[in-house]
Amino acid sequence: MQKSPLPLRIFLAVLLFVCLPLAALARTPPSLGTISVSELPQEARVTLRLIQSGGPYRHRQDDSVFGNRERILPVKPRGYYHEYTVETPGAKNRGARRIIAGDKPPREFFYTDDHYQSFRRIKE
């Protein structure tokens, strides 16, 4: 069996040490900003109160499991997150705004106004 030339082995070792940390960074979820309840749009505050009181909800998709496929929120077991519609005035559909609640009963809340592209943790 022929050994690899030394320069090739050095190149591969350097490549390995450079690429592994970059790959780990690519999988690290972005940091979440925060938003206070008072900064939320009025419709989001109404939705938050509905969640905290257990409904009733206007849309059949509300209180359904949110899969966190985007991996922007902290990774938790399936079923941990549930999604709720935040009404958007003038929208003919559910719009892009949601509150995601974590745990049952909910203990943490996240707001998105761009249909899961970004989230902010709601601080009470």
What are these regions (language model features)?
Residues 5, 9-21:
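Bacterial N-terminal signal peptides
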Residues 11, 23, 29, 99-100, ...:
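Small/flexible residues
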Residues 26-74:
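N-terminal secretory signal peptides
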Residues 55-124:
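Functional cores of ribonucleases/endoribonucleases
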